[in-house]
């Protein structure tokens, strides 16, 4: 009986490890990222290319014409690496290198930083031109989802 319990425990541990390992759909299902804006921004939807242009400093306005205020997250929580990986298929080191070159050459400055999803929502809900990204389950009625990164 002890042997059976031990075997069942090991199998369960293996299943959980595999199910929640990076790269599996179960691991990321709870953290699907969405791009959000202020509901008063006049933006209904945006493409990946439009969002990329704003977060990489190539576009300065939202499709509605309002000056864009992109809100990035610090690298601490993992959402930032996931966002850039899903949006432009780049590692965070590559994105940081890109911004270092632009800053050094005086051609741009990176998006404003927020510590976590709650802070992103606070900033976006209080600024008409703000755009950010959060896990789907963090988005609430104070913001509008304009792009679901998991569905494209």
Where are these regions (language model features)?
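Classic N-terminal secretory signal peptides
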Residues: 7-17
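Exported/periplasmic ABC-transporter solute-binding proteins
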Residues: 28-152
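N-terminal secretory signal peptides that target proteins for export/translocation
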Residues: 1-7
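C-terminal segment of classical bacterial N-terminal signal peptides
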Residues: 15-26
């Amino acid at each position: 009986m002890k042997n059976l319990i031990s075997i069942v425990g090991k199998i369960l541990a293996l299943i959980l490890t595999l199910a929640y390992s990076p790269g599996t759909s179960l691991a990321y299902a709870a953290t699907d990222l969405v791009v959000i804006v202020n509901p008063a921004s006049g933006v209904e939807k945006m493409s990946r290319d439009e969002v990329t242009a704003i977060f990489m400093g190539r576009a300065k306005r939202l499709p509605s014409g309002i000056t864009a205020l992109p809100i990035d997250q610090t690298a601490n929580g993992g959402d930032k690496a996931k966002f850039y990986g899903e949006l432009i298929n780049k590692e965070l080191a590559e994105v940081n290198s890109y911004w270092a070159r632009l800053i050094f050459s005086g051609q741009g400055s990176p998006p404003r930083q927020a510590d976590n999803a709650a802070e992103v929502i606070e900033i976006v809900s209080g600024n008409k031109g703000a755009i950010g990204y959060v896990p789907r389950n963090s988005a609430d009625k104070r913001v509008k989802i304009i792009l679901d990164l998991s569905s494209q």
